[in-house]
Every structure is written in C-alpha cells, then in structure tokens.
C-alpha cells in the first residue's frame, strides 16, 4: 500500500457529502452536482484505491473488510479542512459512528435512497462490488439495507432517487445547498 491522504486546493464553498446504499446514484449524481455547483468531485472509493495502490476487490481479498473500513476512515479524515467538493462515499462509509461524525464535520450530508427493486435493477450484472460477490441475493441485500438504515438516516437531506432523473436529483440537492450555505 502506498501514498498519502491529501485533498488539495480548498475553495470557499461548503462540501456536499453523498451517502447511500450501492446503486442509489452517488457517483453519477455527484459528478453532475459538482459541475453544477462549480465544486470538485471526489469519489471516496477512488481515493482509497489511489492510496492503497490496489483495487477495492484486492483490498477485500488480501486484507479483508476491516482493513478496507480503516482505509475508508483515513480517507474521510482527509476531508477535514477542505471545502468546495462533492464527495461520493462508499455504501458502507456511514456504518462506523466515527465516520458519520467526520462526514458531518466535512459538510452537508445528503443521503440518496432507492427501493431494493430499483437497486437490484441498477446493479444487474455488476460484479465489481465486493459485497455483491458474497451477499448477492435479494434477501441478503435487503438485510444489509435494513441494517444500515439508521446510519443512512443521519443526514441533512434524504432523497429517493427512484423515478427521478439525475438532473432532477441534482437540482434538488443544489437548491438545498444554496439554502444552507
């Protein structure tokens, strides 16, 4: 594993942190939202991969989920003192209470939601997500969603992305951000 945690060039705007279960649209929405707000986009999982020098799947295979979660916390800590970013977190980033505190300190937390059926249709054929390799039944995913619900609820804004265009979700978040800066 290599690298250091750094997020350069802070701007004047407050960060927007997107949380939610896999398949809710965090990365897709985040990229467009960053452009709309004139912010930079950061994907927490991409920061972890860059720092570790190996893929998330490899981190899980070689070191296990616990080590991945430790790297995730380090990446979240790197958000401190940085502003003007839209950050897409991994689906499990909010599991640890300390991460939720760090994310709230980093900026406005927006939780994206969708029903299990919508998520399953969005993730159909996706084999890159480590948790889908072992917990890929609808029942297992439903249990995981339920287990994380209280952590996801710890947000400044919650948006159900089902049946909405990416543009509509971005507009809703951008309006909220402007009202809360």
From Swiss-Prot:
Signal peptide: none annotated. It holds the Pfam family SKI. GO terms for molecular function: ATP binding; magnesium ion binding; shikimate kinase activity. Keywords: Amino-acid biosynthesis, Aromatic amino acid biosynthesis, ATP-binding, Cytoplasm, Kinase, Magnesium, Metal-binding, Nucleotide-binding, Transferase. Binds 1 Mg(2+) ion per subunit. Mg(2+) binds at residue 27. InterPro entries: P-loop_NTPase, Shikimate/glucono_kinase, Shikimate_kinase/TSH1, Shikimate_kinase_CS. PANTHER family: SHIKIMATE KINASE, SHIKIMATE KINASE 1, CHLOROPLASTIC. Belongs to the shikimate kinase family. Monomer. This is Shikimate kinase. It comes from Geobacter sulfurreducens (strain ATCC 51573 / DSM 12127 / PCA). The gene is aroK.
């Amino acid at each position: 594993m290599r690298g250091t945690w750094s997020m350069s060039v802070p701007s004047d705007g407050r960060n927007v942190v997107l949380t939610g279960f896999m398949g809710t649209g965090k990365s897709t929405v985040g990229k467009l939202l960053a452009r709309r707000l004139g912010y930079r986009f950061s994907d927490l999982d991409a920061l972890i991969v860059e720092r570790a020098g190996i893929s998330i799947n490899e981190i899980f295979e070689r070191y296990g989920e616990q080590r991945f979660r430790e790297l995730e916390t380090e990446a979240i800590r790197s958000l401190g003192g940085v502003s003007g970013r839209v950050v897409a977190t991994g689906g499990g980033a909010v599991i640890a209470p300390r991460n939720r505190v760090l994310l709230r300190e980093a900026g406005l937390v927006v939780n994206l939601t969708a029903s299990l059926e919508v998520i399953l249709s969005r993730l159909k054929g996706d084999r890159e997500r480590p948790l889908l390799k072992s917990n890929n039944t609808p029942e297992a995913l439903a249990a995981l969603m339920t287990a994380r619900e209280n952590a996801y609820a710890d947000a400044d804004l919650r948006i159900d992305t089902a049946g909405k265009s990416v543009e509509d979700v971005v507009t809703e978040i951008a309006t909220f951000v402007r009202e809360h800066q």
